[in-house]
UniProtKB/Swiss-Prot annotation:
Protein name: Germin-like protein 8-13
Higher taxonomy: Eukaryota, Viridiplantae, Streptophyta, Embryophyta, Tracheophyta
Organism: Oryza sativa subsp. japonica
Glycosylation, residue list: N75
Disulfide bonds: C32-C48
Assembly with partners or alone: Oligomer (believed to be a pentamer but probably hexamer).
GO MF entry, a single one: manganese ion binding
Length: 219
């Protein structure tokens, strides 16, 4: 009678149990409405509010009912329903946002380090695209009303309204706090010395200083 090596069996069992434990952690309770005042977000989310204090109103949000604040350099309005604005999504692995892009407006190159994004165009049309990390290939396409486009987690991506009417789109994310880093602000809204930025971007010093002034940077 053949015998099965014990070590591979034990290792396989441990890996399986670890995977099950990881995927069921969020199922140990029905929900975990974030207690935002108690501290910052962590890899496992915010601390939960006591269930006895949670009401149906906590699961409702009107955060995306109207356009957000206009970001003038880009002629785009952004409204978010991340965990900070919508505490009920804490620990659920979902969140959403709304973007209203004026004609000629753009959502500039940016990343969501902690989540993938699924974009749905509600009105108008826009060009959506992302840049791969392996070979810097650009994948872009015009997305019309009713169409969707997906952006993989962490990759630089953008939207651009090439039409003559405002484009409205909603996005869903695979994280309650996907994060947001806009490339323009990362480069020009910091205090990194201008000479360093010039070396890293090959832009003229005068242009770097102009952009730092525009985006609130220094140095």
């Amino acid at each position: 009678m053949s015998s099965t090596p014990l070590l591979p069996v034990l290792l396989s069992t441990m890996i399986l149990l670890s995977a099950v434990s990881t995927t069921t952690t969020a199922l140990t309770q029905d929900f975990c409405v974030a207690n935002l005042p108690l501290g910052a977000d962590t890899p496992s989310g915010y601390q939960c509010r006591p269930a006895a204090t949670v009401t149906a109103a906590d699961f409702y949000s009107g955060a995306l009912a109207r356009p957000g604040i206009l970001i003038r350099p880009f002629n785009t309005s952004l409204a978010s329903a991340f965990v900070q604005q919508y505490p009920a999504v804490n620990g659920l692995g979902i969140s959403a946002s709304r973007v209203d892009i004026l004609p000629g407006g753009v959502v500039p190159l940016h990343t969501h380090p902690a989540g993938s994004e699924l974009l749905y165009v509600l009105d108008g049309a826009l060009v959506a695209g992302f840049i791969s990390s392996s070979d810097n290939k650009v994948y872009y396409k015009e997305v019309s009303k009713g169409g969707m486009f997906v952006f993989p987690q962490g990759l630089l991506h953008f939207q651009y309204n090439t039409g003559d009417t405002t484009a409205v789109a909603f996005a869903a994310y695979s994280s309650s706090n996907p994060g947001l880093q806009i490339l323009d602000y990362a480069l020009f809204a910091n205090n990194l010395p201008t000479s360093y930025v010039v070396k890293g971007t090959f832009l003229a010093e005068a242009e770097v200083r102009r952009l730092k002034s525009k985006f609130g940077g220094s140095g």
